[in-house]
């Protein structure tokens, strides 16, 4: 049973609840503020992963299957019992769970925002949060979380002043600008 005085338990539960319920909010609902630094960072990192792997994640956007079972299956694949997991694997799992819970415009119109749908979404959020929490706080995965530095380690691992995509675009723009400037200078000298 979870120790209410254990900061890792508390932070893990709060982070998972923040992220899963954030993903499950109805369209046109304002984003609630993140409950912690790691929650803000998780939202940002998962958003980047979902954009980079949009084709994969979009295939699950309209999933009508059992969300909890899908998360369990993905957890079995990503957090294998044969190896220690990495932050990247954990974030991929959370991005997957968030995608399943996403109530994007298409799903909201299809489900007509009725009370029954809201109850099902809330139930699934609670089930997924509890599953992920129990998985991560189990002896094996908790030890790995601690070895990775806990949620402070998560923040250190992913915190960059600017995302990698920004630097790639900047590098490409700088290269192309230099190339075009050289070409224009070369042509101008020839005239």
From Swiss-Prot:
One GO molecular-function entry: identical protein binding
PTM: Monoubiquitinated by UBQLN1; results in stabilization of BCL2L10 protein abundance and in relocalization from mitochondria to cytoplasm.
Tissue-wise expression: Expressed in multiple embryonic tissues. Restricted to the ovary and testis in adult mice.
Alphabetically ordered keywords of this record: Apoptosis, Cytoplasm, Cytoskeleton, Endoplasmic reticulum, Isopeptide bond, Membrane, Mitochondrion, Nucleus, Transmembrane, Transmembrane helix, Ubl conjugation
One cellular component (GO) term of this entry: mitochondria-associated endoplasmic reticulum membrane contact site
Cofactor: Ca(2+)
Keyword Transmembrane helix set for record: yes
Xref: Gene3D superfamilies: Blc2-like
Record SUPFAM superfamilies: Bcl-2 inhibitors of programmed cell death
InterPro entries in UniProt: Bcl-2-like_sf, Bcl-2_BH1-3, Bcl-2_fam, Bcl2-like
Spans traversing the lipid bilayer: 166-183
Subunit structure: Interacts with BAX. Interacts with BCL2 and BCL2L1/BCLX. Interacts with APAF1. Interacts with ITPR1, ITPR2 and ITPR3; the interaction with ITPR1 is increased in the presence of AHCLY1. Interacts with AHCYL1. Interacts with HIP1R (via ENTH and I/LWEQ domains). Interacts with CASP9. Interacts with BCL2L11/BIM. Interacts with BIK. Interacts with UBQLN4. Interacts with NME2/NM23-H2. Interacts with PMAIP1/NOXA. Interacts with TPX2. Interacts with UBQLN1; in the cytoplasm. Interacts (via BH1 domain) with BECN1.
Protein name: Bcl-2-like protein 10
UniProt organism field: Mus musculus
Taxon lineage: Eukaryota, Metazoa, Chordata, Craniata, Vertebrata
């Amino acid at each position: 049973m979870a120790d209410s005085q254990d900061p890792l338990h508390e932070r893990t539960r709060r982070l998972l609840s923040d992220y899963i319920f954030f993903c499950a909010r109805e369209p046109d609902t304002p984003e609630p503020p993140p409950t912690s630094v790691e929650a803000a960072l998780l939202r940002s990192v998962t958003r980047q992963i979902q954009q980079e792997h949009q084709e994969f994640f979009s295939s699950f956007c309209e999933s009508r299957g059992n969300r909890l079972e899908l998360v369990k299956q993905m957890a079995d694949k990503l957090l294998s019992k044969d190896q220690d997991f990495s932050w990247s694997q954990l974030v991929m799992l959370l991005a997957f769970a968030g995608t399943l819970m996403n109530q994007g415009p298409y799903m909201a119109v299809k489900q007509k925002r009725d009370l029954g749908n809201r109850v099902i979404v809330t139930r699934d959020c609670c089930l997924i949060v509890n599953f992920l929490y129990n998985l991560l706080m189990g002896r094996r995965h908790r030890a790995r979380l601690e070895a990775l530095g806990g949620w402070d380690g998560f923040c250190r691992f992913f915190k960059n002043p600017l995302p990698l995509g920004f630097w790639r675009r900047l590098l490409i723009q700088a290269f192309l600008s230099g190339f075009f400037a050289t070409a224009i200078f070369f042509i101008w000298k020839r005239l």
